[in-house]
């Protein structure tokens, strides 16, 4: 699930800005289908970055113990991409698949960690997974079990230079968020560092700036521990935290129904929130940039797609324009969601199992009202101008493609698998 999408809430540790807006059991089978390119792809595009200062945090456990003799050079950035081992977790998720492809395109030696049954509801078997990740070394393992993951990496017989985490909880539920967005992601850090990794690229989300949801708390906790590791404990270790805005596919859910003549649904006047949506290809390219570009070392990197920020109203207008029809909107009062959430919260006090349903309601409410843009700490407002742009793919082109071809292959959810 892409949790920082625009659907168009718990106290949390939130790092205080310092300088803002600078220029299974072990599955022993290991299958290899690798054909990395020899060429280097390296860009020097600048982007807005954030750095934080924090109180000293409790160190991540196990990072300093049991360092393997299988180690890589700390100067991996001086190597040719074909000699750099990049471990990608969450490799079969929506963004993870594109990250693997982009890394292979740039010539890195990619190790893609996947489960034997991957995809939404585990619909993909090993053969399909190998096909999807062609060109990568596919390692079948389980990121939710640290000992299993470590054994898997040990069996590779070589070290790791960089870990790229594209893990995300399936649906943003309370238990799932802490299991995946925090624990499994931490496992990938611990295991990667044990086998020599010197850099960690984390796919996070721009919405963690205003943490009202459980998955945001889980992501922020890991972010803080990752930063503390690099900045306070181990100066030879670095990170890049990527916080994207909305993904194209998260905004495409209404294309088919509008195409069939139904109205475009939005909350309020359609101007409650805005985003600078980014395509999966462009985001994957930005994540790949973070492996070697030194201006992205130890940075929190919010990133959006090209062009202006778009409200739900404007997104709907673009869709009707492509279809050549007069806009037809259904405006839903956001107070309806507040009422439903209030009822679910009250029931959850008596029946805790309802808490998950209440959380899902809060997620929908959040995306209906909060912009996926940089939150300016000085004004307390979301800023289109301060949200950096990257890439070339536009939402209009995406909508046109979906109208022609449908949303096949664009299923959201279960980024973990």
Swiss-Prot record:
Pathway: Porphyrin-containing compound metabolism; chlorophyll biosynthesis
A Gene Ontology cellular-component term: chloroplast envelope
Matching Pfam families: NAD_binding_10
GO molecular function: 3,8-divinyl protochlorophyllide a 8-vinyl-reductase (NADPH) activity
Tissue: Highly expressed in leaves, stems and flower buds. Detected in roots.
Reactions listed under catalytic activity: protochlorophyllide a + NADP(+) = 3,8-divinyl protochlorophyllide a + NADPH + H(+)
Cell compartments where the protein resides: Plastid, Chloroplast
Residue interval of the organelle targeting sequence: 1-49
pH dependence per the entry: Optimum pH is 7.0.
Activity over temperature: Optimum temperature is 30 degrees Celsius.
InterPro entries in the cross-refs: DVR-like, NAD(P)-bd_dom, NAD(P)-bd_dom_sf
Protein name per UniProt: Divinyl chlorophyllide a 8-vinyl-reductase, chloroplastic
Organism of provenance: Arabidopsis thaliana
Gene, per the UniProt record: DVR
């Amino acid at each position: 699930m892409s949790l920082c999408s625009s659907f168009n809430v718990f106290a949390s540790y939130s790092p205080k800005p310092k300088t803002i807006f600078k220029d299974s059991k072990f599955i022993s089978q290991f299958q290899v289908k690798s054909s990395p390119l020899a060429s280097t792809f390296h860009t020097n595009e600048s982007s807005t970055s954030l750095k934080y200062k924090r109180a000293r945090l409790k160190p991540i456990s196990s990072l300093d113990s049991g360092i393997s003799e299988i180690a890589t050079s700390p100067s991996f950035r001086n190597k040719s991409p074909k000699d750099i081992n990049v471990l990608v977790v969450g490799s079969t998720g929506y963004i993870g698949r594109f990250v693997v492809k982009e890394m292979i395109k740039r010539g890195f030696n990619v190790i893609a960690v996947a489960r034997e049954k991957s995809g939404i509801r585990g619909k993909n078997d090993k053969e399909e997974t190998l096909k999807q990740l062609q060109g990568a070394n596919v390692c079948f393992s389980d990121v939710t079990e640290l000992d299993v993951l470590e054994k898997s990496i040990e069996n590779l017989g070589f070290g790791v230079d960089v870990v790229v985490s594209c893990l995300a909880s399936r649906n943003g539920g309370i238990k799932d968020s802490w299991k995946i967005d925090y624990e499994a992601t931490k496992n990938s850090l611990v295991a990667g560092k044990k086998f020599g990794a010197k850099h960690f690229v984390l796919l996070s989300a721009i919405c963690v700036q205003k943490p009202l949801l459980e998955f945001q708390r889980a992501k922020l906790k890991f972010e803080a521990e990752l930063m503390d590791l690099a900045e306070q404990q181990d100066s030879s270790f670095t990170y890049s935290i990527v916080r994207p805005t909305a993904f194209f596919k998260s905004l495409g859910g209404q294309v088919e129904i509008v195409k069939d003549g139904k109205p475009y649904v939005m909350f309020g006047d359609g101007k409650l929130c805005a985003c600078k949506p980014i395509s999966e290809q462009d985001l994957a390219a930005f994540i790949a940039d973070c492996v070697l570009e030194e201006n992205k070392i130890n940075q929190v990197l919010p990133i959006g797609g090209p062009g202006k920020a778009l409200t739900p109203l404007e997104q709907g207008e673009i869709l009707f324009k492509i279809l050549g029809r007069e806009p037809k909107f259904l405006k839903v009062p956001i107070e309806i969601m507040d009422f439903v959430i209030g009822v679910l919260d009250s029931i959850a006090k008596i029946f805790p199992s309802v808490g998950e349903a209440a959380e899902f309601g809060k997620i929908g409410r959040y995306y209906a009202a909060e912009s996926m843009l940089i939150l300016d700490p000085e004004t307390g407002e979301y800023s289109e101008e301060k949200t950096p742009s990257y890439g070339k793919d536009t939402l209009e082109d995406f909508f046109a493609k979906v109208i022609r071809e449908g949303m096949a292959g664009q299923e959201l959810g279960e980024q973990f698998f």
